[in-house]
């Protein structure tokens, strides 16, 4: 796939991701329309700011940009935030990083994902991206 060629994309406003303890996180996903038949790499952004309203304007510029270039882009509301269940206990907690690592592995296992998963972000999302990378998840 040429990453310079723009492709048609779909947006899924609320994709549930169920953590190992049963807590459901909510994700908004943008991906090429043919990702099911031609799996693509995934880019995860894992934030405490509500995807429904808090970061919508920015998300709707950033994530479709990458999706149109052949990536699945996933914007997750962290545990206890936005449309996700649970309680957020602290910044950069073990629970937050466990959830992010679980999400990386969950994404890699989806039929529309090639198995390659990266994270991105600025500020909070940049910090937790580095912290998850330090854990060296499989994908």
Model region roles, listed by residue range:
Residues 27-30, 45-46, 76, 120-122:
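Generic beta-strand/beta-sheet core signal
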Residues 22, 80, 121, 125:
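Conserved G/P- and acidic residue-centered "switch" motifs that form tight phosphate/ATP-binding loops
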Residues 1-38:
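N-terminal cap/lid segment of alpha/beta-hydrolase-fold proteins
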Residues 22, 100, 132-133:
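Hydrophobic alpha-helical segments that mediate membrane insertion or helix-helix packing
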Residues 34-108:
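Cap/lid segment of the alpha/beta-hydrolase catalytic domain
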Residues 26, 42-43, 72-73, 115-118, ...:
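Beta-sheet entry/capping signal
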